[in-house]
Amino acid sequence: QKFVDDPGAIVIGAAPMASCFGPAYETAMILDTDLRKRKIRDRVPMTYVTSEPYIGHLGLGGVGDSKSMLESEFRNNDIKWITNAKTTKVEAGKLFVTQVDDLGNTYKEHEVPFKLSMMLPAFKGIEPVAAVPELCNPRGFVMIDEFQRSKKFKNIFAAGVCVAIPPVEVTPVATGAPKTGYMIE
């Protein structure tokens, strides 16, 4: 209610190494819809900041026509975006972003103002599991073989979000792959 009474800029997005981009897109669209219903969207500039190389990459190299579909929705709803973005610092009301080109070289520095922000973090595994030597990758996720068994300890199996899934492709700013492929089902 406080924001509605005194609206301002919104920044939504995903930090480098994030691997679950859907909730950030969903948040942007839900906020856009809600602010329009309240008739204050015209007073709320929105910027989507992401490590993805393009809108709709989703950590998967795109899904069908996700790039043009999401870009079109963002344009139609006046949501600006910054891709290939490395969040370098956050201060009260400001997100500092380095945007890189396709080779990873600095292209542009941004200071993005906000009154409300939601950035998806890069996930990490839990310390007790991550601390086991040779069990996990540097982010703390269990490295497994095709049978979902630890590559180092053949009596340890892993399923779900604790599994280390390699990126689908190399991107200028690190993006992870969503972990939906290794659920227990």
For every predicted segment, state its role.
Residues 1-4, 113-184:
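FAD-site-proximal beta/loop scaffold in flavoenzymes
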Residues 2-47:
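Rossmann-like NAD(P)H-binding beta-loop-alpha module
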Residues 33-143:
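A Rossmann-like FAD-binding core segment of flavoenzymes
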Residues 22, 26, 65, 82, ...:
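Conserved active-site and cofactor/substrate-binding residues in soluble primary-metabolism enzymes
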Residues 18, 57, 178, 182:
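Charge-dense, low-complexity intrinsically disordered segments
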Residues 21-24, 56-62, 170-175:
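Short, flexible/disordered intra-domain loops and linkers
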Residues 24-28, 67, 141, 184-185:
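Amphipathic alpha-helical segments in well-structured domains
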Residues 15, 51-53, 161:
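Cofactor-binding loop segments of dinucleotide-utilizing enzymes, especially the Rossmann-like FAD-
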